[in-house]
Structure formats: structure tokens, C-alpha cells
A protein has these predicted regions:
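Glycan-recognition and catalytic cores of secretory/periplasmic carbohydrate-active enzymes
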Residues: 1-219
Length: 219
């Protein structure tokens, strides 16, 4: 909606975005109750807080004064919750488990939800949000962790001589199983055979082309 407002120069889109943000503030952010934003689970999850942080970040980019500060504060609040899903340490793997054998470090990866206990690269613009918050609030921890996310999520990019158990260059695993949570396929230390190749590439594309939204909003 915010991008629609900027592109079409139609304030109705901005008004709708602000009403949507009002709902997010009332029902999610103020309650710290972020849930049901994954397609396959109806529970608390990381994605809902990422969406809330990104939405209010967009509004912060196109507003000024007290309104800007309000949306920025909401962005920070949602981002702190989202960060609680990210690993600050490296999960150990047993010898013979593929992820351990290829040297995967889990720091900087986000868990998905209380129902789906695996890690993935669902990040999209969140690193940009963190860098922006770092500048907005003079808080280096945000940008420091954005760098951890950005470097860590490169680990499983397949290329010749570094295929990471992936059959073809250009693909990226979706369900990375770092716990003994039973998905019924392969187990800890391996990928699940559930695989959606589209969003993983789209998410990494956003991660590795920083500043796109902010550049667009400032045109």
C-alpha cells in the first residue's frame, strides 16, 4: 500500500496503509502477540513480527515529525520481538549429520514458529529494517546483527565445489532441520524433502540487494 501510494501518487493507498498499521498496533504489536502468518501453522511465529516491522518501517519512510516517530517506535518494538527468534549460538550436530559435516553455523538464522521448529532464510527486508533502526536510534546492535544474518545466510548457497547437499546450482533449501523435531523426513542435521524454491531465492535476493525500499520511497 505504501509503495502503491508512492507509485500512483494516490493518498488513498497511504490512508489504507495507516489504517492497517493501526490494526497491527492494536492487535499484534501492543500485545506482543504475533501469530498465524505462515501458511502451514496456526500459532505464534516469526513471520508475523517481520511483517509488522516491515509495514511500520515503510510508513516511517514516508512520514515526518511525531507521526514518523510513532511508526519508528512501532518498528523497533516489532523488530525486538522478531529478533527473539534468531539464534545467537551454534547448534551442535553429531558426526555424520550432513549439516554438521558441511560446517553449518546456526547463529543468525531464525526459527520459524512454535509448531515448525526448523530454521530458514525467511528474512526478505528485515536486515534493511535493522540497519535503518541502527541509524534511527543510534543503536549499533541492530546493524551488527543485520551483518550476522547477512553473512550467515550465505552458507548454503550452492556453487561448484560447495554444493551443500543440494543437487543444482541456483537452488536453496527451505526446511533446514537443526533439531530432533519430528517432521517424518530425514531428521536433525538434514534438509526435509519439503521444498519451495521460489520464496527462498526471493528472500535472499532482497537480503543481498540492500536499500531497495528506502531508495524507492525517497524518489
Amino acid at each position: 500500500l505504501v509503495m502503491g501510494y508512492k507509485y500512483f501518487k494516490d493518498k488513498r493507498y497511504l490512508d489504507s496503509a495507516k489504517r492497517t498499521a493501526g490494526y497491527l498496533e492494536k492487535e499484534l504489536i501492543s500485545k506482543a502477540d504475533y501469530f498465524s502468518s505462515t501458511l502451514d501453522a496456526n500459532c505464534e511465529d516469526k513471520e508475523a513480527s517481520l511483517y509488522a516491522a516491515t509495514a511500520t518501517y515503510y510508513l516511517s519512510l514516508v512520514t515526518k515529525g511525531e507521526e514518523h516517530k510513532h511508526y519508528a517506535d512501532l518498528t523497533k518494538q516489532a523488530a525486538y520481538f522478531a529478533l527473539s527468534w534468531y539464534y545467537l549460538w551454534d547448534v551442535p550436530f553429531a558426526p555424520g549429520q550432513m549439516l554438521g559435516d558441511i560446517g553449518l553455523k546456526t547463529r543468525g538464522w531464525g526459527n520459524v514458529s512454535v509448531e515448525n521448529n526448523h530454521i530458514d532464510v525467511f528474512v526478505f527486508e528485515f536486515a534493511d529494517v535493522l540497519r535503518w533502526l541502527s541509524n534511527e536510534y543510534n543503536e549499533s546492535r541492530f546493524s551488527n546483527f543485520a551483518e550476522v544474518i547477512s553473512t550467515s545466510m550465505r552458507q548454503l548457497l550452492p556453487y561448484e565445489g560447495h554444493m551443500c547437499g543440494i543437487a543444482k546450482v541456483g537452488y536453496y533449501p527451505e526446511v533446514v532441520q537443526h533439531t530432533s523435531w519430528d517432521y517424518g523426513k530425514n531428521g536433525k542435521g538434514y534438509y526435509n524433502d519439503i521444498f519451495a524454491p521460489g520464496w527462498t531465492v526471493a528472500s535472499l535476493w532482497e537480503l543481498f540487494t540492500p536499500g531497495r525500499a528506502e531508495t524507492f520511497m525517497k524518489k
